[in-house]
Amino acid sequence: MNLIMVISINIILSSILILVAFWLPQLNSYTEKANPYECGFDPMSSARLPFSMKFFLVAITFLLFDLEIALLLPIPWAIQTYNINTMLLAAFILVSILALGLAYEWKQKGLEWTE
């Protein structure tokens, strides 16, 4: 019963904070919020230039392999379980999927900067 109360209070408080975070900025809108800020100087060029897709791909690749490390770090503790074959199979499948994704990105020349 206490666990349900704690979880429900956390959900309610989180929902209230999210709603307030979305609602408050809309109350005080003025044109200076939409203008780019460049260290107090007038902007040299438009701040709304298109973003290079290469940076985005590198960031996504970093996040994927960061996730892989986060999922593989608990394996030494998971080896102490009774069903070690299932755990090792799951880890092997995870690494295989990520390796296939890396090979595909490499084949599509997503990791090359020169064009």
Curated annotation (Swiss-Prot):
Topological category with respect to the lipid bilayer: Multi-pass membrane protein
Disulfide topology: none
UniProt entry keywords in alphabetical sequence: Electron transport, Membrane, Mitochondrion, Mitochondrion inner membrane, NAD, Respiratory chain, Translocase, Transmembrane, Transmembrane helix, Transport, Ubiquinone
InterPro entries found in the cross-reference section: NADH_UbQ/plastoQ_OxRdtase_su3 (IPR000440), NDAH_ubi_oxred_su3_sf (IPR038430)
Enzyme class name: translocase
Gene3D superfamilies per record: NADH:ubiquinone/plastoquinone oxidoreductase, chain 3
MF GO annotations: NADH dehydrogenase (ubiquinone) activity
Gene Ontology terms: biological process: mitochondrial electron transport, NADH to ubiquinone
Enzyme Commission number: 7.1.1.2
Membrane-spanning ranges: 3-23, 55-75, 84-104
Functional note: Core subunit of the mitochondrial membrane respiratory chain NADH dehydrogenase (Complex I) which catalyzes electron transfer from NADH through the respiratory chain, using ubiquinone as an electron acceptor. Essential for the catalytic activity of complex I.
Self-association state and partner proteins as the record states: Core subunit of respiratory chain NADH dehydrogenase (Complex I) which is composed of 45 different subunits. Interacts with TMEM186. Interacts with TMEM242.
Protein name per Swiss-Prot or TrEMBL: NADH-ubiquinone oxidoreductase chain 3
